[in-house]
Amino acid sequence: MAAAVIVNLYAGAGAARRRWPAVARLLAERLGPLAAHFTEGPGHATLLAHQLAGTGFDPLIAAGGDGTWNEVVNGILSSGSSARLGLLPLAKGGDFARSIGLAGPRHAVETLAAGEVRKVDVVRVRFRGPAGEGRERHFINIASFGLGAEAALRVRGWNRFLPGRARYLAAALPTLAAGRGFDARLWLDDAAPIEFNATTVALANGRYHGGGILIAPQAAIDDGLIDVTLVERVGLAEVAANLRLLYSGDIYSHPKVHHWRAVRVRAEAEPAAPLELDGEPVGTLPLEAEVLPRALRLISPAATAP
């Protein structure tokens, strides 16, 4: 079947527009001529993916960043197609790319040419939209509420010359400096509720978010489980003193960081906490999340394929 490329030139605060011509040449050299479909705004990648997958295009190659990939995943799933997904990183964050060992555009093109397919989990989430309406969406990397979602809201459109990590940390500063937390209540599968005053909670399929923070070092994208990381209420000084733990894989060694695994998660927050999926702000809690095991066919680096 014919492949199609969905390109988001706005990804990475415009960095994708500069990178795309060189990446397009690489694609043509390794895969031959491909039809490129360019997004025009938020949600358009989902619409394009739904239409293309529904009419038989396979694979769909998503060129952009984590948000673009999220939209394309949602489009494939809503189409009912089993089309394969290929990834082309054009933005700086690339947290899901880190989780699967995708090193950059050139490596991504070679991965697409090799064509190794891995069946990976997707997480379906029901939550409250901006107007209070019920919504449903999927993520492949990480959903977070609290600090992570507040930072995702602030970071949109920030200076593209700042690395993804620096943008995220700068966006988190106001919340950390204010020392704000929220009362979180979690239900994991059929267990009794867990309650904490929290700074942030991550529901993880992948391992990285926020431009390289290793928020779920034990997560696997094909184990049928959500890794839940909860950080109790902390302030700026405490985060600064433990910054290395965010990137070293030792985050669970801190006494205020908690880790669980579940197939299904329900969450409430007081006050209602903002929610982001794969780096994109989408609404607020309450939420219900459930793993869809191996629901997506992902073209993956050979070293990570089963």
Predicted region positions:
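Catalytic core of DAGKc-family lipid kinases
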Residues: 30, 39, 77-199
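Short Gly/Thr/Asp-enriched flexible loops that form oxyanion-binding sites at enzyme active sites
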Residues: 68-80
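ATP/NTP phosphate-donor binding region
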Residues: 1-60, 70, 107-110, 305-306
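ATP/nucleoside-binding phosphotransfer catalytic cores, i.e., glycine-rich phosphate-binding loops
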Residues: 188-190, 195, 220-221, 230-306
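Glycine-rich beta-strand-to-loop/alpha-helix junction loops that act as flexible
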Residues: 9, 63-65, 88-90
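Glycine-rich phosphate/pyrophosphate-binding beta-alpha loops
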Residues: 144, 148, 202-215, 281
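Gly/Ser/Thr-rich active-site loops/lids in small-molecule metabolic enzymes
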Residues: 159-167, 209-211, 217-238
